């Protein structure tokens, strides 16, 4: 609703319509992307990342399950930590990727690509039922349960501090690739320090029914820093400059991690 009111242009991504860019006055795509990306690099930008696939993973064998479906190791990931994972097909070609967070001893939250969420869940369920039925693991799709606002840029930490005044956002207390619980107006939320732009970034997850309120609160907190909403086109630019891949855009089903110069994420010990 907020995106429509602010005249966002939309594009189809998977089963969703995502804000493509936010033109001001008579801006075209190129002009809007240059403005949005400069704001994200110089001060602060905000992206609606709600459409990323989210799979709740629970069970005593959850760590072992992740160890089997991703190319890298997962058994030693600490509670409250996040890790990027790459998923391959049986033929060794890149299938999907995303960041998974360890919420508890036997509890993880996996994110997938927007377009791949349903297929990834289906594949994981298939593995559990046919390949590894002995594993104690339960999967639940929670993509539409949570709204996600991603705030990035040099001033993102200052904006988060305004939203969560009682929380310590220092690098020691809240390092990169970690997660903490928080509250906004007594509503529980999850805060992840994750970056898809190369800039300092935080993602806030909250129940979907509070998504618009969260977005408006972030915009209000970021006003003094001229926080700028940006769409998928700017996201593609920022992540490409950093060297991050998007499965389905940089891959076509025939790409291996080595083709993508990502052999660093393939464990040699399992």
Language-model-detected regions and their locations in the chain:
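Well-ordered mid-protein domain cores that form the structural environment of catalytic cofactors
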Residues: 72-127
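Conserved, structured C-terminal
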Residues: 1-12, 18-20, 28, 104-107, ...
